[in-house]
């Protein structure tokens, strides 16, 4: 049996608080934390619409880069460097030109710090990205890091991907709080981000000083923003949106993410998605940089790749050429033009060379890039023979192109070849900002700020809370409703009886107070040594649920490392949105809420009785009344055991007040004010 332990209550009284003179509006915030660029959108409750938080220069996006400025010697600071993120960081790099203290594309290194195969994962990153990453050991634990150093021969400081992301997020936060108060926050991640990558994103946000954010999937955010606009502009209704299946094709600077988003019954679901953590515009930049570096070496003998500063300058130049070329081709009829873009590049002192790029050469250099896009799409639509069963593309109503790299003409051609040009919807869709806008709307949705006709429930999150049975029939949630899939959660418990030899972990999904009223999943048993008093064992229970509804349950005795585990299937994964909605109505219904309140009163009375039964309380009761006091406590316990399930809440509240008054009489001459001991929940 699982039973809650004694929890101390802390009361804080605020007196004479000053009047709030902060006139900034409280807003719902959405952040698209991108590999190359990030964007901030806020939903204003007063205007009932979103707006973007612009940079000081008026841009809607911010470079996801960090430049470490060297501090003056002898200033007493722990670090020799100061982090400068976003546009100021990029401008400082352009002015000072030190590539060894300039960092970009670090999103690809997020969330691999705690992996057992960390060395193998880092090698994969090195193969797929031109970012100087390595593994170091800190306190006996391996972690991913980058080197900050003035020159290759100097000593270095290290910085983690999470720390770099936190610098970007802190810069974004500074921009937000200039004009707004943060009422709630959503940060988007690729649909295929795993639990570790999600946790790393949350960690970076908290390091930046944000409240713990909601984490949401980028394709869902884009689809939400799109359907919201259709409803708001009167182009369609919420009911008509229910028949809409959207393919979100999100090709950004560092990641490729493609998802099918279905709407049904007011729910937004992601039944199928795919992606590649190492495919995006940065790969195109890599290909162009290598091509022109080889050209410069063969023409002049100068090796650009041996000089990090020159290499990074070349990379910036070819990125500009890429954009100019793609703009020219997109403007041409049928995107069939083969323009030529030329730029002069200074590579060695004052020496310069003219670089030229045609669309034909551009596509030739990126043939493998296009092939990998097609392969991902084929896997998504045709299936991979494993968990992904494929998706009938004829069911897709429209395709949204999201991310800056969808401006590459050949990428547009590929999408049109797959779905047909008539299904690509671009009117009013800003590929750079739609994800952030959707994130802000989702935050507003979670805060109940949207009109009823605009609200959408997403089902790419846990639809009903997942938990275990405690206190004989209490449902204790371990993974809460709304958690991003895949999701995991762990809570620690202890035993309810002396010399307990095993504990049974019963798992259900729902959220109703009474465990038996929820949807039963399964159970496991964990063996214990059996020679320990109640409250001594430490038992960690972990629940995990993946995007396909598979549930993993594990219980570990932390004192001897014994464990039990098993896999189950979620019945909820096969429920219709209407069935889930009806269950949610029961969770928020009057009957369940009354039971929650009643159980809380029962819990308080149980805690008071347990406290009165403890040796500490027996010691302070005078001998002449000790027998009467202990009999009174025992009588109250017997009453509670008999009536806690059948008596109404008001009767238990009366008994709690009666017991409290009775104990005060017994202890009126004894010492008082002993603090309750905080304990773990009990198994």
From Swiss-Prot:
Coiled-coil zones: none
One GO CC term on file: cytoplasm
Disulfide-bond pairs as recorded: none
Protein's cellular compartments: Cytoplasm
Domain of life: Eukaryota
Chief site of localization: cytoplasm
Pfam families xref list: HSP70
Key words of the record: ATP-binding, Cytoplasm, Nucleotide-binding, Protein biosynthesis, Stress response
Keyword Metal-binding attributed: no
GO BP annotations listed: translation
Molecular function as annotated in GO: ATP binding; ATP-dependent protein folding chaperone
Protein family membership: Belongs to the heat shock protein 70 family.
Name of the protein in its database record: Heat shock protein ECU02_0100
Organism: Encephalitozoon cuniculi (strain GB-M1) (Microsporidian parasite)
């Amino acid at each position: 049996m699982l039973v809650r332990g004694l929890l101390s209550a802390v009361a804080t009284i605020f007196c004479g608080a000053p009047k709030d003179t902060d006139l900034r509006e409280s807003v719902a915030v959405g952040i698209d934390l991108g590999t190359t660029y990030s964007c901030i959108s806020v939903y204003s409750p007063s205007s009932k619409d979103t707006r973007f938080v612009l940079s000081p220069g008026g841009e809607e996006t911010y470079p996801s880069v960090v430049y470490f400025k060297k501090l003056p010697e002898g200033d007493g600071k722990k670090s020799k460097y100061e982090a400068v993120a976003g546009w100021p960081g990029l401008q400082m790099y352009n002015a000072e030109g030190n590539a060894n203290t300039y960092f970009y594309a670090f999103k690809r290194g997020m969330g691999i710090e705690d992996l057992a195969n960390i060395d193998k994962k880092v090698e994969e990153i090195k193969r797929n990205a031109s970012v100087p990453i390595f593994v170091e050991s800190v306190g006996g634990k391996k972690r991913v890091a980058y080197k900050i150093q003035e020159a290759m021969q100097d000593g270095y400081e290290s910085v983690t991907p999470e720390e770099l992301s936190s610098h970007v997020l802190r810069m974004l936060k500074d921009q937000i709080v200039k004009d707004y108060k943060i009422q709630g926050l959503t940060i988007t991640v690729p649909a295929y981000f795993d639990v570790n990558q999600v946790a790393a994103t949350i960690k970076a946000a908290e390091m930046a000083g944000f409240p713990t954010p909601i984490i949401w999937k980028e394709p869902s955010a884009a689809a939400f923003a799109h359907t919201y606009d259709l409803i708001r502009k009167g182009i369609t209704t919420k009911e008509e949106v229910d028949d809409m299946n959207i393919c979100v094709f999100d090709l950004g600077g560092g990641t490729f993410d493609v998802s099918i988003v279905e709407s049904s019954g007011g729910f937004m679901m992601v039944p199928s998605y795919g992606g590649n953590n190492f495919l995006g515009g940065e790969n195109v930049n890599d290909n162009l940089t290598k091509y022109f570096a080889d050209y410069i070496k063969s023409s002049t003998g100068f090796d650009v790749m041996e000089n990090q500063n020159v290499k990074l300058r070349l990379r910036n130049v070819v990125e500009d050429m890429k954009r100019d070329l793609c703009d020219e081709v997109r403007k041409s009829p049928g995107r069939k033009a083969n323009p030529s873009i030329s730029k002069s590049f200074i590579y060695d002192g004052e020496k310069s060379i003219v670089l030229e790029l045609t669309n034909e050469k551009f596509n030739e250099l990126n043939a493998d890039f296009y092939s990998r896009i097609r392969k991902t799409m084929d896997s998504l639509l045709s299936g991979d023979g494993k968990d992904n069963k494929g998706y009938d593309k004829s069911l897709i109503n429209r395709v949204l192109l999201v991310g800056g790299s969808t401006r590459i003409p050949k990428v547009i051609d590929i999408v049109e070849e797959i779905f047909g040009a008539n299904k690509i919807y671009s009117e009013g869709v800003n590929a750079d900002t739609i994800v952030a806008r959707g994130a802000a709307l989702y935050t507003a949705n979670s805060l109940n700020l949207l009109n009823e006709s605009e609200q959408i429930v997403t089902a790419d999150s846990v639809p009903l809370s997942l938990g275990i049975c405690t206190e004989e029939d209490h449902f204790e949630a371990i993974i809460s409703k709304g958690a991003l899939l895949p999701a995991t959660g762990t809570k620690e418990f202890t035993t309810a009886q002396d010399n307990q030899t095993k504990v049974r972990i019963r798992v259900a999904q729902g959220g109703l107070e009474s465990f038996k009223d929820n949807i039963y999943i399964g159970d496991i048993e964990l063996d214990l040594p059996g020679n320990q008093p109640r409250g001594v064992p430490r038992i960690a229970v972990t629940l995990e649920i993946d995007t396909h509804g598979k549930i993993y349950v594990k219980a570990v005795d932390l004192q001897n490392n014994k464990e039990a585990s098993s896999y189950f299937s979620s019945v909820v994964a096969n429920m219709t949105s209407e069935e889930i909605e009806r269950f949610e109505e029961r969770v928020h219904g009057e009957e369940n809420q009354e039971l929650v309140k009643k159980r809380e009163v029962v819990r308080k009375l149980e805690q008071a009785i347990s406290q009165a039964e403890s040796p500490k309380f027996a010691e302070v009761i005078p001998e002449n009344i000790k027998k009467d006091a202990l009999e009174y406590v025992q009588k109250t316990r017997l009453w509670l055991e008999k009536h806690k399930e059948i008596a109404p809440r008001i009767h238990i509240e009366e008994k709690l007040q009666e017991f409290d008054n009775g104990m005060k009489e017994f202890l009126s001459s004894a010492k008082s004010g002993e603090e309750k001991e905080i304990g773990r929940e009990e198994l």
